[in-house]
């Protein structure tokens, strides 16, 4: 790299370098200031979690159903797709009929995915037993007669 090239790079990027240095320095200043100025808790309940004035009971290791993670993933997927549709809607005049057909296909694929998720039971929060009873009402009536 010659001297003129490095000088050109510095000339183009000096503002970003100063911004980066100031931002990192400000973060360090706030962390150090909080460490020096922050209060110290010396009570015996220092590490006990406090939640809405209620003492915690049991362990914090709760097992969550995978349904919560599935719903979160579905939300993110459909949220990103809504962003695509919003971007398309802002440029609908420029895209014309071709863009409209492409968006219609995109929406159809979204609806097909939603129907598929509903059919496999990914959006169903009921237990498997009640789902079976709904799917096969004859089994439900036979089970009730045997009781």
Curated annotation (Swiss-Prot):
Extract the Pfam families matched here: Oxidored_q4
Q: What is its EC number?
A: 7.1.1.-
Tell me the keywords, alphabetical order. Answer: Cell inner membrane, Cell membrane, Membrane, NAD, Quinone, Translocase, Transmembrane, Transmembrane helix, Transport, Ubiquinone
EC class of this enzyme? translocase
Instruction: Give the record's membrane topology.
Output: Multi-pass membrane protein
Q: Which domain of life is it from?
A: Bacteria
Transmembrane stretches, start-end: 16-36, 68-88, 97-117
Entry's Gene Ontology molecular function annotations: NADH dehydrogenase (ubiquinone) activity; NADH:ubiquinone reductase (non-electrogenic) activity; quinone binding
What InterPro entries does the database record attribute to this sequence?
Answer: NAD(P)H_OxRDtase_bac/plastid (IPR023043), NADH_UbQ/plastoQ_OxRdtase_su3 (IPR000440), NDAH_ubi_oxred_su3_sf (IPR038430)
Compartment list: Cell inner membrane
Reaction catalysis annotation: a quinone + NADH + 5 H(+)(in) = a quinol + NAD(+) + 4 H(+)(out)
Q: Into which family does the record put it?
A: Belongs to the complex I subunit 3 family.
Listed under subunit, the entry gives: NDH-1 is composed of 13 different subunits. Subunits NuoA, H, J, K, L, M, N constitute the membrane sector of the complex.
Q: What is this protein called?
A: NADH-quinone oxidoreductase subunit A
Query: What species does this protein belong to?
Result: Salmonella arizonae (strain ATCC BAA-731 / CDC346-86 / RSK2980)
